Amino acid sequence: MRQRNIKNLDERLAANSAFLIDDPRACRGRWAEIFGNDNPIMLEIGCGKGKFITSRAAANPDVNYIAAEGQSSVVLRAMEKAQESQLCNLRIFIDFIHDLRDYFEEGELSGLYLNFSDPWPKARHAKRRL
């Protein structure tokens, strides 16, 4: 289903900005510093509204989680869930990941979640597929 436009999107993103990474490429090699600890780091590509990643972060406070999503209107829902649960081990960024090496150094991630990614079935969308 298509995501509807959200009123006051920019203001609501700013209100939850503690979880938002503005320039994730600049964080390459510095994720432990950003979290302030050396806990394992797990990445979810395509977090959607954040149900999975926020539940994982709440259940595992000794693991750091990063959620990536390309649509800001969807990310807002994940950020609001993180704010409600006061998750200090979760960071979120808005971007479509094409190459993990642009965001993470080798060995920086401990694991990766890829749940229900967009299928992009048309031939002209091949470049968007995982």
What are the residue ranges of the model-derived segments?
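Short beta-strand element of Class I
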Residues: 63-66
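Conserved glycine-rich SAM-binding loop
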Residues: 48
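Mobile active-site "lid"/loop adjacent to the S-adenosyl-L-methionine
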Residues: 110-130
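Conserved SAM/SAH-binding beta-strand->alpha-helix loop
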Residues: 71
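Conserved beta-strand/loop positions that form the S-adenosyl-L-methionine
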Residues: 45, 68
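S-adenosyl-L-methionine
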Residues: 1-43, 51-58, 80-106
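Short alpha-helix immediately C-terminal to the canonical SAM-binding loop
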Residues: 75-76
